[in-house]
């Protein structure tokens, strides 16, 4: 069951040092069998790991997806080319190696945060593909800048229009922006930039944490 840290149940020994909380270094494996439903046919499937500590290698159906030496950032791998047809058994394995360099604090060992499958259409907003800033903010008006990375995994170019909305806690639309029609080439990604103007926004304060 994830999240998981295999070190916390090991025996303490001073020979390992404080950086590992006096717990042993080592290599561990995670294995998972799963069957995709028919609804995933023709769609894009990725695996997202919020955190693996550390030096991880991920495999799907015998194919090595990649190696990540670091342990404090999320990891995304595209599974689509290597998956079996819906209804057939898939096998995933993750190798984790905690030997070698360590931080100055206890960082755990294994898949210490959540992991999940991300299923999308061929044309979709990329994972972590929404970037929002507020370049202008006052009690009278605010401007929200949104950059959205649209990914096209299909074999031909696609025409895309994005509609962004800002809603309050009740669902009322406070601002909206429809982008121009853009072309996203086959196998590429494109950043769509939009601005939304808010009139008399409810500003965030500790007493009124409006988001």
What are these regions (language model features)?
Residues 1-7:
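Predominantly extracellular/luminal regions of secreted and cell-surface proteins
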Residues 73-75, 180-183, 189-199:
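A beta-strand/beta-hairpin structural motif
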Residues 95, 163-165, 208-211:
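Internal, hydrophobic beta-strand segments that form the core of beta-sheet-rich folds
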Residues 40-44, 83-89, 157, 189, ...:
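Short glycine/proline/serine/threonine-rich loop/turn segments at secondary-structure transition edges
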Residues 134-142:
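Short, solvent-exposed loop/linker segments at the N-terminal edge
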Residues 60, 141-183, 192-193:
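Beta-strand-rich binding/interaction modules
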Residues 27, 87, 141, 185-189:
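Solvent-exposed, conformationally flexible loop/turn segments
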Residues 9, 20-131, 153-154, 168-172:
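Accessory beta-strand-rich segments of carbohydrate-active enzymes
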């Amino acid at each position: 069951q994830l999240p998981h840290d295999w070190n916390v149940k090991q025996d303490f020994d001073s020979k390992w040092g404080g950086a590992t909380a006096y717990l042993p270094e080592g290599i561990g494996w995670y294995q998972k069998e799963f069957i995709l439903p028919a609804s995933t046919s023709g769609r894009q499937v990725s695996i997202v790991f919020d955190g693996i500590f550390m030096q991880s290698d991920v495999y799907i159906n015998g194919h090595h997806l990649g190696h990540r030496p670091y342990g404090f950032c999320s990891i995304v791998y595209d599974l689509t080319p290597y998956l079996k047809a819906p209804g057939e058994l898939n096998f995933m394995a993750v190798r984790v190696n905690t030997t070698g360099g360590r931080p100055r604090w206890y960082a755990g060992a294994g898949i210490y945060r959540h992991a999940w499958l991300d299923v999308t259409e061929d044309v979709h907003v990329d994972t972590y593909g929404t970037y929002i800033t507020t370049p202008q903010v006052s009690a009278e008006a605010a401007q929200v800048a949104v950059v959205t990375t649209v990914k096209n995994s299909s074999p031909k170019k696609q025409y895309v229009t994005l509609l962004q909305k800002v809603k309050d806690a009740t669902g009322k639309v406070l601002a909206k922006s429809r982008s121009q029609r853009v072309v996203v080439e086959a196998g590429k990604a494109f950043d769509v930039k939009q601005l939304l103007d808010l009139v008399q926004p409810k500003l965030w304060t500790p007493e009124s944490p409006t988001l």
